[in-house]
């Protein structure tokens, strides 16, 4: 990204952490990560979107498996504040601002041989098996 002449960005360590909850009805503070391991041919993405003024957080885990199938889960988990990225079995921890973090998930995921089944999420969740996934990654 090229900034206009005279403009600059200054990120402070505290900018990496949670922000004060605003009064906006649709206030949303979210964080997500895309990951890929070319050696293991596995990738995925993980997201938490806090909507504290609505009383919930959206949690999504999606792992692309080497055989083309996916492990997926989405939840709207109850939250009461915007104090942390921790909802629905997922947690993001800032270990060192802008350098290191931990992604944790402990819960069920849907195993889908055919990812296009998510065109109809209700049907996909009814017709595919679930398994437990413990994830703790830095």
Which sequence ranges carry the predicted segments?
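Targeting-peptide/extracellular-domain and disordered-appendage signature
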Residues: 1-138
